Amino acid sequence: MKTKNVTSSQKHSSLNRATSKKQIPISNVTADEIVAVGSTIELTLGAQVDPQSAQGAIRVVRGCEQVATDIALAKRGHVVTVRLDEAVIGACELIVSELLGTKGERLVDYYRLPFLVVPISGKIPNGLRVEHAVRLFIDDLGVVRLAPGEATRAGHVDVVKAVHRTKGTPVELAFDERGERVEIDKQLAQLAQRRADKYGRIHDTLFQRIEQAKESDRVPIVVWPRLELPPASYNKPADHRSVEPPEGEKKVTATIRKASAALRAVLQRSKIQLLKESRADEDVPCMRATATVAQIRRLAENKAVGAILFDDVSAINDLADSIAVARSDRAHVDGFDGTGIRVAVFESGPSVTTNLVFADRFTGSPSASDHARLTSAIVKNIESNKPHGHAPDCDLFSANSSDNDALRWAVNDQHCTVISQSFHRNSEPGGSGLQSDDVLKDFLALRWPFPTIVQAAGNFFVGDEDGIIPIEDEFVNHKGYNSLAIGNHDDTAGAMSGSSVFRNPTTTHGDRELPELAANGTSVSANGQNMSGTSFAAPATAGVTALLQDVDGVLCSWPEGCRAILMASAGRNIRGGTWWQDVVSGVDARDGAGAVDAQAGVLIAQQRRFRDAPATRRGWDVGTISSSVIGQDRLATFRYRVTVPNLIFFPKVKVALAWDSAVTSFLGFPLASTLTVDLDLLVRDSRGVQVASAASWDNSYEVVEFTARRGETYEIIIRRWSGTDSVWYGVAWTVTGFSLVDVVAFPFDQLTVAQIQRP
């Protein structure tokens, strides 16, 4: 890839020439921009730079390593050029510290410019800025993302998100290994058609099972009708909690019931018997049955059928420190304890309910389970002289069966707005894409009462029940777009557990990132139990979600808002680079957006904002994005604004955006949970300069975080890269840092040597 350096005269005709004031360098590279190998970065200043100071004050780092550069001056000393070594690839930062002018005056105190070096086979047209790029290998039935610069004998395709530097116009490009332009949309459409030709309406997991079976063998299945529903069929109320189905929901329900009736008639004509114990729930149109392989193949040819999936009914189970490290205790002190919030723990058991108080239970005779005793107690318990859970005053429901009927009971009958799940099915760890349960939960999140669903990412270890070899090849167990998968960190939020599953699912552009978050699941004790695993990180996050909903009831009806606040408030990055740096670099991160933080989340939840509102340090909003609020430049016509207080030292801004997939039959393809809209997240400073971006293809969320300037105000901008569907979204932001009060109150006497030495 070749890029044209933008000169200082082209970009800035009138610089402030005062040399007595500290300056912000003007760069020809935008924050988080992708540049070519061996590129030159220019920094323009309003005064002459001292050559010796430039050599000492300017450096480029990749992680903790300083990389080789050639530094020179141009334009009579007003421009510093930094040429990168050809060997530099990956996420980097250009850092300027105490840069002096020729008269000895300090021109720059401190300046950081994050950017990425990614090899791209083709030439990027002049005037375009690259914001994201992935290298893909497309085979007969799937996509493999290659590492930056990696090559294969079969070739590759580099796919690029770029924008015009001055107009901001989005441009998508793709190049083959020879640098020739190719039509990536056409290639992906051909891939989708090849998959449809092979699998038809049969999910690939089920397809693989029946390929090894006899035509007369009976197989448990889940059948969905053909549905054509956008992710947001109506404008969901955003100013109050929806205590009953909104008016628009009634029209959706009518559509669902019509499709369900048609499917039921098809099953009857096919002489396929529904399971007797399956719930008669017309609001959730999928139906469980057992059918022969021959019946399944014939059923897949019926146009009333949306998809046929394998009905996996297996269930494999995956407190004081937990509460403290998530800072839920600080939220309790502020008066938020989950009062009035309905939370369900979805898993088999417990039969022993000592120190547990349930508002109701799915069945009165569940199986015995110490695992379920602990997951329930993490949310809420009444053990004497012990912490009472993350949401001690919530209404806790026991969906005490691994059967999905228990999940539907919790959502549709008990109207729970938070669901915690800490088990997985046999087929999920080895499945590279969404499985049957993922589709169901994505559907439930889109229908009243709009639950926020939190799940354990999974655990791997030698000898585990999943039997995947090597063990690190296990996929994150729950892959839905409209829910959250949670990893496991230690008691200090300083390290991820070595057993916490992190492998990302396979997607069209290979940049999906799971899990979304991490919470403490290591050596968690409550109610006489002590265990470790992501199983215990999930209920901790569910409890924190209940605290957020306690702050503002609107969040009970907006899982998109809950997801955004949880990710924006996760200010502790446990491992690797920032979320976006890991995504662009192709690093399969383990901690997602970071460690769950109830205190930070509550502070955000207390600051509900609105479109184009004055700037605040923290805030959140929810709503519907439709074509009516998208301009010709694909940017939303409204803004959110964040301000950085002057008395905050080392400030950082973190912003998260979350939206939904659609559970629908799309253009004649089988029903699936599909992202029909691709949103990006941009942040600009008061000069209009872009300071951060996150622009993945395959996620239902974006996260940006960057070092900010005190006293500055930033604009948060949503861009719709592709798609036309209306979609519900949530956005949240916060500024973190240190104040004088923080320094005075810091417990230096409790700081250990290990904490000081931690990288």
Task: For the regions a language model picked out, list residue spans one by one.
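Acidic, Ser/Thr/Gly/Pro-rich low-complexity segments and short DxT(G/T)-type signature motifs
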Residues: 7, 12-37, 48-50, 55-59, ...
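Inhibitory N-terminal propeptides of secreted protease zymogens
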Residues: 120-307
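Acidic-leg catalytic submotif of subtilisin-like serine proteases
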Residues: 138-159, 221-228, 306, 326-368, ...
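Subtilisin-like serine protease catalytic core
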Residues: 210-216, 301, 330-405, 413-418, ...
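Secreted peptidase-domain scaffold signal
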Residues: 237, 587-677, 731-749, 753-758
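Catalytic-core segments of hydrolase enzymes
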Residues: 312, 417-526, 567-570, 651-663
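Hydrolase catalytic cores
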Residues: 518-581
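Noncatalytic accessory or regulatory domains flanking protease catalytic cores in secreted, cell-surface
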Residues: 581-591, 677-735
